[in-house]
A protein has these predicted regions:
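Acidic, S/T/G-rich, low-cysteine, solvent-exposed domains in lumenal/extracellular/periplasmic regions
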Residues: 144, 165, 214-328
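Non-transmembrane functional regions of envelope-associated proteins
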Residues: 1-199, 203, 291-357
Length: 357
C-alpha cells in the first residue's frame, strides 16, 4: 500500500503542494519511481476522470503571458502522468486506473463508464471498476468480480482488484469470467472464485484490521501492519526531488541512485559496507526492493478525506477501526491470489432467515 497518509499530507502541505495533488509533480513521479523499483502492477484507487485543475488554470492564463515566460510553464499534468504510465508499461509494469460505472436516468443509454481523461486513456492503461458493495448494515464484506450494463449484457467490466490479479498473473485479454450456476463458482482462467449465492460477488476473507491503525495512548505498539504500507512522501523522496525531512529514501531502490545520507558517511569503508548492505551502487540488486514483483495500490488513508469503510475488523480488540477504502481492494486481491474464500452454508438464504432482510 502506498498511502496519502498523515505523514505525506503534512510533508506535502509544508512543501506547499495543494490537494488534489498535481498529476505531473506527484502522481507521474510516483509511477516512475515505483516502476523503476520493480513494481509488477501499479493500481490507482484515485479517480482522474476530470482534467488536472492546476494545469487547466495555467493553460487558461498562459495566453496572457509574454512569450518569453510561457516556456517556463510546466507541462500539462495529464500529459506528464500519461507519459509516466507509458514509460512504466514499456518497463514491464502494468498500470491499472480506477473507473466508475455511473447511472443517469435521463441519459441514453443511462449507464456508462466514467473513464480517466483522454490523455491518460490514449496510452492504454488497464482499467477496473471501484463501485462500492455494502451490506445492509453498511459493512464492506462483498467484492464484485465484474460489472455489467443493460445495453451490453455480455460485456464484463472487471473490478479494480480483478484487473490487478489479471495483470499480475499475465492473463490474456481474451479470458472472461463465466458463472457455473450449479457449483456457484465463477471461473476466470485457472481461477475459481466462490460466489456469494447467485451473484457476481464473493465474500472477502479479510486478513486483519487496518494496516496503519495504532492502539491509542501507547507509542510502544506498532501499527497492525496487515499489509506492508508506505507513505507517498517516501515514494517521492529521491535525489532529484526535495521534500521536508529529505533523506532520499526511495533512491536506495532505484538503479543508479545513492541516498544523500549514504554519501555523507565520511569513512569510505563504512560507506562501501553500507552500500553493500543496502544492495545499491555497483552491487545494486532490484530484488531487494520491497516493491519488486509486487502489486502496489495507491490511495488515501488520511482521515480528512473520509475514504474509509467498516469491515469485519471494525471492533477488533474492542477498538473502533475504520479501514481505508484502498485496503478493501488489497484484501480482495489477496483473497483471490490465495484462493482463501469464505464458504457460506445456505448461501444468502442463511442471512434472510437470521435477519429477515
Amino acid at each position: 500500500l502506498v498511502e496519502v497518509d498523515d505523514e505525506s499530507w503534512r510533508i506535502l502541505k509544508e512543501k506547499k503542494v495543494p490537494w488534489p495533488y498535481p498529476r505531473g509533480d506527484i502522481w507521474a513521479r510516483a509511477v516512475e519511481n515505483l516502476s523503476k523499483a520493480g513494481a509488477k502492477v501499479i493500481a490507482f484507487d484515485i479517480q482522474f476522470d476530470s482534467p488536472d485543475a492546476r494545469s487547466e488554470y495555467l493553460r487558461s492564463v498562459s495566453n496572457t503571458l509574454p512569450a518569453e515566460f510561457q516556456q517556463y510553464l510546466p507541462g500539462h499534468g495529464d500529459v506528464l502522468l500519461a507519459e509516466s504510465i507509458r514509460n512504466a508499461q514499456n518497463n514491464g509494469t502494468k498500470v491499472v486506473m480506477d473507473v466508475k460505472m455511473v447511472r443517469e436516468p435521463t441519459r441514453i443509454p443511462p449507464t456508462y463508464i466514467a473513464y480517466p481523461v483522454p490523455e491518460i486513456m490514449e496510452v492504454n492503461p488497464e482499467t477496473g471498476l471501484i463501485n462500492d458493495m455494502l451490506d445492509t448494515d453498511g459493512f464492506s464484506r462483498q467484492y464484485s468480480i465484474a460489472g455489467y450494463m443493460d445495453h451490453e449484457p455480455n460485456t464484463a467490466y472487471l473490478t479494480l482488484g480483478m484487473k490487478c490479479v489479471k495483470s499480475f498473473l499475465g492473463m490474456s485479454d481474451s479470458i472472461v469470467p463465466t458463472f457455473n450456476e450449479k457449483e456457484r463458482v465463477w471461473k476466470f482462467g485457472d481461477l475459481r472464485i466462490n460466489a456469494y449465492g447467485k451473484t457476481n460477488n464473493f465474500l472477502v476473507n479479510y486478513y486483519g484490521p487496518p494496516s496503519g491503525y495504532k492502539i491509542p495512548g501507547d507509542n510502544s505498539y506498532k501499527p497492525w501492519g496487515t499489509f506492508p504500507r508506505f507513505s507517498l512522501s517516501q515514494i517521492l523522496d529521491t535525489q532529484d526531488y526535495d521534500i521536508p525531512e529529505d533523506i532520499d529514501w526511495m533512491s536506495q531502490f532505484i538503479p543508479g541512485q545513492v541516498p544523500d545520507w549514504v554519501l555523507q558517511i565520511k569513512d569510505s569503508s563504512e560507506q562501501k559496507e553500507m552500500m553493500s548492505m543496502l544492495g545499491i551502487g555497483s552491487e545494486f540488486d532490484i530484488e531487494k526492493s520491497p516493491f519488486y514483483n509486487k502489486i502496489v495500490l495507491l490511495g488515501v488513508s488520511v482521515e480528512v478525506l473520509h475514504d474509509v469503510k467498516s469491515t469485519p475488523f471494525y471492533n477488533y480488540m474492542d477498538l473502533s477501526q475504520l479501514t481505508p477504502g484502498m485496503e478493501t481492494h488489497a484484501n480482495a486481491i489477496q483473497t483471490i491470489l490465495h484462493g482463501n474464500y469464505i464458504d457460506v452454508f445456505g448461501y444468502k438464504t442463511t442471512r434472510y432467515i437470521v435477519d429477515g432482510s
